[in-house]
């Protein structure tokens, strides 16, 4: 039967499996890329605040 343009295609088991795999890969990427990047940015901010407010810099 011909697929109408306005209706979405039904998701097959293969499509569902691929979608689940893509979501799992995205979760792994968050753990390996995003978290270390955020940690480095936070450490840089902490260092700059420390360097700007230490007593030796004021005098």
Swiss-Prot record:
Segments of this protein annotated with the region Disordered: 1-23
Name under which the protein is recorded: Single-pass membrane and coiled-coil domain-containing protein 4
Family in the record: Belongs to the SMCO4 family.
Coiled-coil residue spans: 9-30
Membrane topology according to the record: Single-pass membrane protein
Organism: Takifugu rubripes (Japanese pufferfish)
Ranges that cross the membrane: 32-52
Localization: Membrane
Bias (Basic and acidic residues): 9-23
Sorted UniProt keywords: Coiled coil, Membrane, Transmembrane, Transmembrane helix
Record GO cellular component, one term: membrane
Gene from which this protein is expressed: smco4
């Amino acid at each position: 039967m011909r697929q109408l343009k306005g209706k979405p295609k039904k998701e097959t088991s293969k499509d569902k499996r691929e979608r689940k795999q893509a979501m799992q890969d995205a979760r792994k990427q968050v753990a390996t890329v995003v978290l270390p990047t955020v940690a480095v940015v936070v450490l840089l901010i902490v260092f700059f605040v420390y360097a700007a407010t230490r007593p030796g810099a004021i005098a």
